[in-house]
Swiss-Prot record:
Residues 75-119 are annotated as: Disordered. Residues 79-88 have a biased composition (Pro residues). One of its GO terms (cellular component) is cytoplasm. This is Sterile alpha motif domain-containing protein 5. Keywords: Cytoplasm.
Amino acid sequence: MCTNIVYEWLKALQLPQYAESFVDNGYDDLEVCKQIGDPDLDAIGVLAPAHRRRILEAVRRLREQDANAAGLYFTLEPQPAPPGPPADAVPTGRRGEPCGGPAQGTRGDSRGHTTAPRSRELVSYPKLKLKIMIRDKLVRDGIHLSKPPYSRKVPMAGILEYLMNWPKSSQSR
């Protein structure tokens, strides 16, 4: 069985039986899954109407989450409520910029220019969803945590040589 984000997504929808078909048809990432429609479900082999509805509804939610994700900040632990901020105060992000302010959308994308109202409250995410969001962001940004500068390989030959040359005095005991 495949072990990736699409499998976890289908498992959450209680439809893990389609995971292998999704991957075989090229739907191995949630970004790709956001494009799924009825013809795609036919090709994947999702024939049950209830399963099709569940998947299409989940795809719609994925698209909405992507549209609402621009400019959101989150915390891993809940923070105590501040003592009565003024009603006209604008929450600030990590860098002191106002959330939803001019810092959004400066990378050339149109996500910062949506007209839908957004909540300025802190959002709590379940652990799995947060892991998925972080993984997707790392993939989008081309960051590989298993490669330098984020990690380095320890040469196996060096470890073996060290163990082979372990002090002879400790072996004679």
